[in-house]
Amino acid sequence: MTVTPAFITDRSELDRFFSQLPKSRNSDAIIISSFQLMPAMHDKLQAIDLPTVGVNVPAESGYFDASISIDNSSAMTMAVRLLRSLGHTNIAFCSDYIPADMVYNTSQRTQAFADAAQANATDGITFSLLTADAHDAPLSKSDLASQLTAKLLSLPERPTAVCVETDQVAIALVKELRKQQLNVPEDISVLGFDDAEIAQAADLSTIRQEPIELGRIAGRKVLQLLRNEPLEHPHELQDPLLVLRNTTSRIDSGAAPAE
């Protein structure tokens, strides 16, 4: 099986790809990672009989023949419960800006965090959702972390723990927090998402997903669809795993967060 990648970063690139699809029909199937299909795009794929498999696509999608995704709901529930068990009750979630005309897997991650925090509100949890300001061109991770840190430190009461949408952003955030004379994890705990190779090098606590296994499962689903074989479980979720390293710790109950 030969795989040809196409990189799409915004709605205009997505529209361009789908407008050219009927003319460049040199594929037997398509795997879409991390974002939601629009109804018109789904209809176009059906019209040209192109099997479509999603990897880490929003759960409410419904526009894929099959899918395999990390269980964001379970992951965020684990994250909130972990931080609560360490004594944290004021927790933030930090993410990049997502244009209104795109729906990414990380959009669902943000909502899953909010749902998990609300479910634990009776246990004293309060939370903040911090998102970068709107921007047309992608921000560097350093600039993104700088903006998110400014928002974090501008809150009426600084959170003692932060969940971050990806490891790359989390690592940049840790660096920026330390530039602002905050110790991680003594003053503020930081939890990433992915467990990318860089997370281990940075000693970052995170939530692990298995991208290679996600790809293998997606590939098997593609082959089954091409052979017209029935899929016993067309849509599957991968269980996340907490990985504890050196950016999360128990809060000092005697210390009040800086205002």
What are these regions (language model features)?
Residues 37-39, 169-170:
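Glycine-rich nucleotide phosphate-binding loop and flanking beta-alpha elements
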Residues 38-46:
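Active-site-adjacent beta->alpha loops and helix N-cap segments on the catalytic face
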Residues 1-37, 57:
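Central regulatory/effector-binding core of bacterial HTH transcription factors
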Residues 13, 42, 252:
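Short acidic, gly/pro-rich beta-turn/loop elements at beta-sheet edges
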Residues 1-4, 29, 46-54, 58-259:
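Bacterial carbohydrate/catabolite-sensing allosteric modules
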